[in-house]
Amino acid sequence: MSVVISDAWRQRFGGTARLYGEKALQLFADAHICVVGIGGVGSWAAEALARTGIGAITLIDMDDVCVTNTNRQIHALRDNVGLAKAEVMAERIRQINPECRVTVVDDFVTPDNVAQYMSVGYSYVIDAIDSVRPKAALIAYCRRNKIPLVTTGGAGGQIDPTQIQVTDLAKTIQDPLAAKLRERLKSDFGVVKNSKGKLGVDCVFSTEALVYPQSDGTVCAMKATAEGPKRMDCASGFGAATMVTATFGFVAVSHALKKMMAKAARQG
């Protein structure tokens, strides 16, 4: 059943309709999109979804806001430190659009619970997990069950958002997280390339050579390898910039919306 677009909704998202068209406005209002991982990439993806008029958004994460998230996460404000990221982001979405149906799942996706959390019938899933095994489990499940998904590679260690693009996961470069993810998909879930050398998984990544932090406080550009740092944690690993992490999230949302519109056009 289609969502009835209210006058208030139309006021908020008239600019969306003038850009994408009236049919797309209804498509977005009817959509239910899940963001898994509400951090440096996922928080910005959730923001973009809310401000585009997506009717239902599910946020999955069990992490809390940390003061060290300040450089890259939209919900990392002084008064939010120590609060659950998904809950804080959900309240922000309700402030953006009180009519958005927001669901919070206070948990981390694992190989054991991925089927439970992906059984909702999402219009699209945006994977912003930064740990390899749960990320692989989510991708493998969605791929096997034909749930539309876009994944994101590592967003740390980069300063140039103009080098971000979307390709098949098999084709990424300069991305240790994506490289490790390919290995885990193959070894743990039997996901291998097809005859065209593709995995059939859309991935947001950057062609930029990574900047690695050094123990003496300097930084150094090195060729990315699967053995390099893979995460942006609170104490070590890659540094990060909002300009890059946010763009990863925005590109993921843009790609998902484009795919949704193309599918709707094919179905008439």
Swiss-Prot record:
Keywords: ATP-binding, Ligase, Membrane, Nucleotide-binding, Transmembrane, Transmembrane helix. Its EC number is 6.1.-.-. Its main location: membrane. GO terms for cellular component: membrane. GO terms for biological process: cyclic threonylcarbamoyladenosine biosynthetic process. Pfam families: ThiF (PF00899). It is found in: Membrane. One of its GO terms (molecular function) is ATP binding. CDD domains: YgdL_like (cd00755). The keyword Membrane applies. It is a single-pass membrane protein. InterPro entries: ThiF/MoeB/HesA (IPR045886), ThiF_NAD_FAD-bd (IPR000594), Ubiquitin-activating_enz (IPR035985). The chain crosses the membrane at residues 237-257. Disruption phenotype: Cells lacking this gene have a normal growth phenotype, but are unable to survive in a competitive growth situation with the wild-type strain. They display only the t(6)A but not the ct(6)A modification in tRNAs, and have lower decoding efficiency than wild-type. They show no defects in motility or antibiotic sensitivity. In growth competition experiments, a tcdA mutant shows reduced fitness compared to wild-type, but outcompetes a csdA mutant. NCBIfam families: PRK15116.1. Interacts with CsdE. Catalyzes the ATP-dependent dehydration of threonylcarbamoyladenosine at position 37 (t(6)A37) to form cyclic t(6)A37 (ct(6)A37) in tRNAs that read codons beginning with adenine. TcdA is also part of a sulfur transfer pathway; is able to accept sulfur from CsdA directly in vitro, but CsdE might act as the sulfur donor in vivo. ct(6)A is involved in promoting decoding efficiency. It is an unstable modification that can be easily hydrolyzed and converted to t(6)A during nucleoside preparation by conventional methods. This explains why it was described as t(6)A37 in earlier studies. Belongs to the HesA/MoeB/ThiF family. This is tRNA threonylcarbamoyladenosine dehydratase. It comes from Escherichia coli (strain K12).
